[in-house]
Amino acid sequence: MMRLRGSAMLRELLLRPPAAVGAVLRRAQPLGTLCRRPRGGSRPTAGLVAAARLHPWWGGGGRAKGPGAGGLSSSPSEILQELGKGGTPPQQQQQQQQQPGASPPAAPGPKDSPGETDAFGNSEGKEMVAAGDNKIKQGLLPSLEDLLFYTIAEGQEKIPVHKFITALKSTGLRTSDPRLKECMDMLRLTLQTTSDGVMLDKDLFKKCVQSNIVLLTQAFRRKFVIPDFMSFTSHIDELYESAKKQSGGKVADYIPQLAKFSPDLWGVSVCTVDGQRHSIGDTKVPFCLQSCVKPLKYAIAVNDLGTEYVHRYVGKEPSGLRFNKLFLNEDDKPHNPMVNAGAIVVTSLIKQGVNNAEKFDYVMQFLNKMAGNEYVGFSNATFQSERESGDRNFAIGYYLKEKKCFPEGTDMVGILDFYFQLCSIEVTCESASVMAATLANGGFCPITGERVLSPEAVRNTLSLMHSCGMYDFSGQFAFHVGLPAKSGVAGGILLVVPNVMGMMCWSPPLDKMGNSVKGIHFCHDLVSLCNFHNYDNLRHFAKKLDPRREGGDQRVKSVINLLFAAYTGDVSALRRFALSAMDMEQRDYDSRTALHVAAAEGHVEVVKFLLEACKVNPFPKDRWNNTPMDEALHFGHHDVFKILQEYQVQYTPQGDSDDGKGNQTVHKNLDGLL
């Protein structure tokens, strides 16, 4: 009786509008049929809180909105402004190209709408089993565009454009990302040409995303290096606010162009190796790289000339001395490329035999590629001031010339001019974070995918940044923070977390070592919170956060959604879960699988799908040692019992396992699409 009452209530909930759901839930008895009452005892049932999580529609639907995403308007004009104006319309040929990864439908007629049965629910299912794996794959694997549509739509027939953009931003991608240009162009064209411009049906959505489907699928499947990017950025914002309270330090004033910056300026930008972006504070204010350019020009020199040639002229050791000392090592070479003497020598190695104008253009083009074509400028006023107040650097230059540290035929005065020019190159926190991410990504720019630097150049650059990048504070920074970094007198700190992300922290007030006060505090706090230190143990860490791991909440939701789809007989939802490489054998707290629930409810289509398409183990035991066959027999579902019995001859039991080994082949096929 309880079971009939619960089923009727569920139907009522699904048919009522959202406004009526709350009142029904308050009157409702707990849904007991998801975890059946065992024979000979009782079992805990889910409360209202669990019920509200069973389906996104009950909890309000949608994704958590991050900062900057919540206020996005749904009006066509403001969405157009968000997507950017202008741009070349996509070619007609692009609109008609085949969907990547698409396969022909298993049978004619509309499929995939929530609640409908698929090919496994009719006589065609038997033909598929007889025909083998090929047709099963066709039934299991519709196009990736379909999967993406249903992931965002959450049961609706159309997707509002602003909802898609908000969901996209929550993954860390930006609408200005060069990799998404075709998608954004098509969205803009759709908004301008359709009558219902702010809504996308499935066909329009597929046209918009098909050229960028792999990247978008990775984003929404949370396959980026930082899966829960919204949670990570909330931590970054907290660290930013903590560092903002730091006072002290003095703005560099040896030239007027540096002295004019307000000590209250403070910005942090993050770019991961997958192109996830986050910025907070004064991240669009241009400032000069100053000494932050030293590792970049060293990387250019090694990329062009090789390690062996470059280190004929400059060493690799920390000097233990001030960065502008007139001092060489025992071989009469500068100690490393991060002190002024070494940086001047490295400058002389770039594009030898070419005039300064061509050299400067070459380096600017290189830095533009590293920054993904984001802002890289030049401050002529800073250059003039540096040259006029550069007596110490001229002294170092003449000392190097006297010790024959330059390649033969080098014009020392011309090289110093070029050196001052490179120090006067301007960036913003946002563009510099992409440069740092290029170093973190092995020389590939994360937002363009272009290889800019060789692996050798990246490895050597990060090694020297780690040991020599923070002036006289380098040893302490390596000890406490343990990450490659380079600071500059303009207040910037270029920070690299190898294989994860790059960051630029900028605040003009400097400590007595010449490093940004707020930037140093931020870096210390970051490594205290996250296990990014070079020697943090990734397997046995106790208290630190690892943003590279997916949180437990997502796994809990995964189990709830899987079992609820099996309970309601929603084969379309199960197909989407299988497409997203979900473990279809995962269990709840009673060790019950989706097959247990489907067998108890008598959903023939779901049982067939799980057995024939997903190849799940038909013999899992729950905490009461009941198998799906026991469930079907107990509730009188003889057709399900017969299917499970027949499937025994096709399946070799692997034992009760929680790791979903029976799904490995399907998972490999799914991941192969990406």
UniProtKB/Swiss-Prot annotation:
Entry superkingdom: Eukaryota
Pfam families per the UniProt record, alphabetical: Ank_2, EF-hand_14, Glutaminase
N6-succinyllysine PTM positions: K135, K169
GO MF annotation: an example: identical protein binding
Catalytic activities: L-glutamine + H2O = L-glutamate + NH4(+)
Gly residues bias spans: 58-71
Signal peptide start and end residues: none
Positions where N6-acetyllysine occurs in the chain: K316
UniProt-annotated stretches for the region Highly mobile activation loop: 320-327
Residue ranges, annotated region (Disordered): 56-123, 652-674
Listed SMART domains: ANK
Transit peptide: 1-54
InterPro entries, sorted: Ankyrin_rpt, Ankyrin_rpt-contain_sf, Beta-lactam/transpept-like, Glutaminase, Glutaminase_EF-hand
Positions bound to substrate: S291, N340, E386, N393, Y419, Y471, V489
UniProt entry tagged with the keyword Secreted: no
Summary of the knockout phenotype: Death during the first days after birth. Pups appear normal and display normal levels of activity, but their activity is disorganized. Pups do not orient to the dam, do not succeed in grasping a nipple and do not feed properly. In addition, they display altered respiration.
PROSITE patterns for this protein: ANK_REP_REGION, ANK_REPEAT
Effect ascribed to mutating K325A: Constitutive enzyme activity that is fully active also in the absence phosphate. Forms oligomers with full, phosphate-independent activity. Forms dimers with full, phosphate-independent activity
Disulphide bridges: none
GO CC annotations, alphabetized: cytosol; mitochondrial matrix; synapse
Subunit structure, as described in the record: Homotetramer, dimer of dimers. The tetramers can assemble into rod-like oligomers (in vitro), but the physiological significance of this is not clear. Interacts with RAF1 and MAP2K2. Interacts with ATCAY; the interaction is direct and may control GLS localization, negatively regulating its activity.
Domains (record comment): A highly mobile activation loop at the dimer-dimer interface is important for enzyme activity. The C-terminal ANK repeats prevent the assembly of the supra-tetrameric filaments.
Official protein name in the record: Glutaminase kidney isoform, mitochondrial
Organism phylogeny: Eukaryota, Metazoa, Chordata, Craniata, Vertebrata
Gene (UniProt): Gls
